[in-house]
Curated annotation (Swiss-Prot):
Signal peptide: 1-23
Name of the molecule in the record: Beta-defensin 50
Described function: Has bactericidal activity.
Keyword entries, A-Z: Antibiotic, Antimicrobial, Defensin, Disulfide bond, Secreted, Signal
Record-linked InterPro entries: Defb50
One biological process term in Gene Ontology: defense response to bacterium
Localisation: Secreted
Disulfide topology: C34-C63, C46-C64
Highest taxon listed in the record's lineage: Eukaryota
TM ranges: none
GO cellular component terms, semicolon-separated: extracellular region
Gene coding for it: Defb50
Length: 73
């Protein structure tokens, strides 16, 4: 049940952040990065945390989802 809720959360976040297909200026994509759990506890600036299968499988890390605009790349 937790996995289902997590998948719904991630798909909801992706639908909010991914506003278009392709590389048009102003398009927002989501980047994933793994950070140590201790950094997450002590204030790493991450807007959304989650788990993604196959990414950040280490028990000592969490997955951070960061929205990125293509004009900032």
């Amino acid at each position: 049940m937790k996995t289902l809720h997590l998948l719904l959360l991630i798909s909801g976040l992706l639908s909010v952040f991914v506003k278009g297909v392709g590389s048009h200026p102003g398009t927002v994509h989501v980047r994933f990065k793994c950070i140590p759990k201790i950094a997450a506890v002590f204030g790493d600036n991450c807007p959304f945390y989650g788990n993604v299968d196959g990414l950040c499988n280490d028990k000592k890390s969490v997955c951070c989802m960061v929205p990125v605009r293509l004009d900032n790349i």
